[in-house]
A protein has these predicted regions:
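Eukaryotic N-terminal targeting leaders
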Residues: 1-2
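Membrane-proximal extracytoplasmic
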Residues: 90-91
Length: 828
């Protein structure tokens, strides 16, 4: 059983970027979905996975030349080689590691500990050295509470000076003199507001715990961030405070009124988030700086954005007065807000420098990747804060958490057709160019497995999952459903259908819209659409809602705003028809030649006609149950009683009815849809598979099959309808046919597959965690294989089975697996 994973196995906990090697590392937490591990991503599909020595979560992650350093929740300090892609050494120090700092020019990594000491680890000899820095804060303040090291940072221009951030304050340590040079103790006197949200705490002296400590890019100043949301700028020469401020207020270390964030109710206040992360950035000139801050905002606001203080050129320290220095930080040249999605909070960030790694990776950054508390990622241009799409910018696996995926589908597409589908889009410089792709065998004659994934922000991405072979076209396609619908919220996609042969795609939303896209050249490049309402119950032309930066790709074509509940079934055929079913029970058939709606009805109408002629007794309770389409499929075959073949639409419902519609051309070139009949099955219909009666070959409505209708071709076909509890093969529309009932387990998804030259079979995923194959038409079990150890059984209904026996299913919230169940189970 071949397995290929896509995505991130668990919640992301750490991000690290190396601008020299152009690589990005991602660490994850240990969870029920998988162990903590490290992913290293490079250009295109370059990816390696580094497992931790023991089950744990990644807490700290840093690049150091050709090595990757990691500290995990088990207190293991692990050193990985990027060259050999393996673990070099794992060491568990005698004290808990709380901070890590390294430099590519040094052979040592500095480890800050929970007891306040700093240890040195020799990366070449792979062992701890004798050198250690004692708890300097405890030596200076013997009565202080237990202090641990929070941050470590070498002076940007003097490797002999180390800034140690304890949770009680900061210290500059000199390696040359082997002693502490200056202590930075942030003490708020009585009456000083500080960054506190609680007005009662103003009337007592306090020392807010430290969370961050960083150098100015030239080492001229020191900046500390605190739990009470204070930002304090210090003079490293004499240890005095130059400016203490919050995101909104200044001089908060001096007695005064201050401002407090009101709570939800009168007389209450809102707590503020601590300062999670600080980056003191510089342009090409290291004296032209700005401060990027994550955190420090009231907890009751929905959008907790990043804040960037654009300071401009730093005053010359030796010739500037104290007032000039203080006002430089009190009144920045510009205050920028880098927006984040509502209801989220940034807990960590990773800057992407333009060219070099200097100044802790903060010189001339062009982008920032932010980690949210949920484990999702967002990427923004810097310093403008404009969203950057991860499509063809970040690695494919990272897009599954950017943001999370809420629906997945897969469609086989002919190879040459997919090779021609390369979108042209205006895009910034790529910042992942490292690594070298591995060589895989080239399967030229296989249809490509094209995955469609919809994300929480309304973005749909298409990409080739392959067959564990060489990916010739590894680029992703992107569709902005939110822009096509005309709004930014309430854009959850519930169904996607991709017609590869026609280069068309349809997306169905929970809000009840169906949006159709078609490949083409954008005639509205660089233009913003005119806001207008969508027509209810009719088709709306949305050609002008194409993305402004997209020159060629999948463009919006038309939209149906049904407004009758979420889309529950959707099928986009290769021959210009789209069928959509809604939870309210309605069914719509769209002919894209107009485009026009050629059929619109409720499933209850044609189900009633079947009940009138039925001898079965039905209670009033079952009659009143809501019914809606759950499965749709187009086919070309001869109906029972006809002497010609035609295009058919089969509709399966949640109550087990299978209706058939006939699509016939009119004189003007348009088509009409007419109801033919309905058959009642025992359970919810999960799959409809039209096949040739003599061979079992699929009889879908392909372009070749429809073209053959002009020549009078007749297809003797049958329909295999699969329900949760059984399957039935019958001649549409009302022939009873033969039935098979599953013995003990319910079926979640199924389809017709072909194994090499051995013929066709029905392959399904079942509730006991097995994939089973059944012969056609006898419906006898051929074999079974356990897949629950690879895929999540609870999400089997969301899995997709292809005609070649590939199964794409979920492993976790942001990880999928593509497996092929055919083979001999022998390792080569």
């Amino acid at each position: 059983m071949e397995i290929k994973n896509f995505g991130i196995n668990s919640q992301i906990s750490q991000i690290a970027y190396d601008p020299v090697q152009s690589l990005l590392a991602v660490g994850t937490n240990e969870s029920k979905y998988g162990p903590g591990q490290i992913y290293v991503f490079g250009r295109k599909r370059v990816e390696i996975v580094l497992p931790l020595p023991h089950p744990a979560s990644v807490k700290i992650l840093q690049f150091c030349a050709e090595k990757l350093l990691c500290v995990d929740s088990r207190n293991d300090f692990s050193v990985f080689s990027l060259e050999t892609k393996r673990l070099l050494n794992a060491h568990s120090p005698p004290a808990k590691i709380t901070a890590l700092h390294s430099d590519p020019t040094l052979d040592y990594a500095l480890l800050g500990t929970g007891n306040g000491e700093v240890l040195a680890y020799d990366l070449d000899r792979e062992q701890l050295t004798q050198f250690r820095i004692p708890n300097l804060w405890r030596e200076q303040f013997p009565r202080s509470r237990l202090t641990s090291v929070v941050t470590l940072s070498l002076h940007p221009r003097d490797i002999g000076s180390l800034l140690i951030g304890y949770n009680a304050g900061a210290v500059i340590y000199s390696f040359k003199q082997n002693k502490a040079l200056k202590f930075f103790d942030y003490v708020l006197p009585k009456g000083a507001p500080g960054g506190d949200s609680d007005p009662a705490s103003v009337f007592k002296e306090r020392s807010p715990p430290l969370t961050q400590a960083v150098w100015h890019p030239t080492g001229t100043f020191i900046l500390t961030g605190h739990e009470d949301s204070s930002l304090v700028v210090w003079d490293p020469k004499d240890g005095r405070i130059i400016q203490a401020r919050t995101l909104q207020d200044t001089n908060v270390d001096k007695p005064g009124p201050g401002t407090f964030s009101p709570g939800a109710n009168p007389g209450t206040f809102a707590l503020k988030s601590p300062i999670f992360k600080i980056a003191w950035c510089a342009n090409e000139d290291p004296d032209d700086t700005g401060i990027l801050v994550a955190g420090g905002q009231p907890s009751n606001i929905a959008a907790k954005s990043l804040t960037f203080f654009e300071l401009g050129r730093t005053p010359v320290y030796s010739t500037s007065s104290w007032q000039v220095l203080s006002s430089h930080f009190e009144d920045p040249k510009r205050l920028r807000i880098l927006p984040c999605p509502p209801g989220t909070e940034v807990v960590d960030l990773c800057l992407i420098p333009r060219t070099n790694p200097h100044f802790a990776g903060c010189q001339d950054p062009i982008a920032v990747i932010a980690l949210l508390a949920s484990g999702e990622l967002i990427s923004m241009s810097f310093p403008s804060g404009m969203p950057i799409t991860p499509t063809n910018q970040l690695h494919l696996s990272m897009t599954l958490a950017h943001p999370y995926v809420n629906h997945l589908h897969l469609a086989p597409v002919e190879r040459t057709r997919w090779l021609g589908m390369t979108e042209k889009r205006q895009q910034g410089p790529k910042f992942l160019n490292g690594g070298l792709e591995a060589n895989y065998p080239l399967k030229r004659f296989e249809h490509r497995n094209i995955v469609q994934m919809s994300h929480a922000d309304g973005t749909v991405r298409l990409w080739d999952a392959g067959h564990h072979d060489e990916i010739e076209n590894d680029a992703l396609l992107q569709i902005d459903v939110a822009r096509a619908v005309g709004r930014q919220d309430n854009v959850e996609v519930t169904k996607i259908s991709f017609a590869g042969a026609a280069s068309e795609l349809s997306a169905g939303l929970r809000s009840g819209e169906v949006v159709v896209f078609r490949w083409g050249i954008n005639k509205h490049l660089g233009q913003e659409p005119i806001p207008r309402e969508n027509e209810q119950g009719a088709l709306t032309n949305i050609v002008d809602r194409s993305e402004a930066d997209l020159k060629e790709g999948l463009l919006p074509l038309t939209l149906l705003a049904e407004g009758n509940g979420p889309v529950t079934a959707l099928k986009h055929s290769d021959v210009g028809f789209v069928a959509a079913g809604f939870e309210g029970g309605s069914l719509a058939i769209i002919d894209l030649r107009g485009p026009a709606i050629i059929y619109h009805s409720n499933v209850g109408e044609f189900v009633k006609s079947e009940k009138r002629g039925s001898f079965r007794r039905s209670s009033t309770q079952s009659a009143s149950k809501a019914e809606w389409p759950t499965s749709l499929e187009f086919s070309v075959m001869t109906l029972d009683g006809d002497d010609y073949s035609s295009i058919l639409l089969h509709v399966g419902t949640n109550l087990g009815h299978v209706a058939t519609f006939k699509l016939l051309p009119e004189a003007g070139g348009r088509y009409t849809a007419s109801y033919v009949g309905v058959l009642s099955l025992d359970d919810k219909v999960i799959s409809l598979c039209p096949i040739y009666a003599d061979t079992g070959r699929p009889a879908y409505a392909s372009q070749a099959a429809v073209a053959g209708l002009r020549n009078g071709s007749k297809i003797n076909g049958v329909l295999l309808a699969v329900t949760s509890s059984g399957a039935r093969i019958f001649k549409p529309a009302t022939n009873k046919g033969a039935q098979k009932t599953w013995d003990q387990f319910l079926c979640d998804t199924a389809t017709i597959v072909r194994y090499e030259e051995l013929g066709y079979a029905l392959l399904g995923l079942y509730g006991d965690g097995y994939a089973r194959g059944y012969s056609i038409p006898a419906m006898k079990e051929i074999g079974s294989v356990k897949v629950s150890d690879v895929l999540d059984v609870r999400r089997f209904s969301e899995a997709v089975i292809t005609s070649t026996g590939d199964i794409l299913g979920w492993k976790g919230p942001a990880e999928t697996a593509l497996i092929n169940i055919f083979g001999t189970n022998l390792k080569l």
